Amino acid sequence: DTPQALEDKGGWLSSEMLDAFLAYAKYCFKEFPEVKYWITINEPTSMAGQQYVSGTFPPARVNEFAKCFQAEYNQNLVHARIVNAYKAGGYPGKIGIVHALQTVYPASSSAGDQHAAELKDAFENRFYLDGTLAGKYSKKTLDLVREIIEANGQEMIEIKAEDEEILAQAAQKLDFVGVNYYFSKFMKEYHGENII
């Protein structure tokens, strides 16, 4: 749970949240040296999606895809900052992240269903995996993200050039990626009003 004081400042959309989360992680590393396996964030995509798309987690927003992707981007960034700090601290353990990944399939072989599956895969998997494992966002992933955001009448998120080095360094230092897998999704093309 996000402390209310940080939620009031924007939660995962705020740079103050990122700085506080990094400081908390550094404190934990020093305070608990006997811990040898660290997870920076568990299921960040679930958190952001439920905060800004389904509205089931505070701040309980619905269909705010740009904010969802910005929160995801910020979570990837602070994850990278934490990995880099852990490795710079010379701690003897291992550090990683846990993603909830969902295999996405088109409902049919139609071009529309295939594209719908690509969009959902970018939303559920690619955006996180690009930042975590590749240390950069591919043009294809960003094009799909932009399409989702613009289809919902919102503006593209801010991706800063200076963050790329932080992400790239962490991707090379990451010890493991945990995967929580619950189910697959089959996607069908749809061009109507969002029903969430």
Placement of each model-derived feature along the sequence:
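Active-site region of glycoside hydrolase catalytic domains
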Residues: 1-196
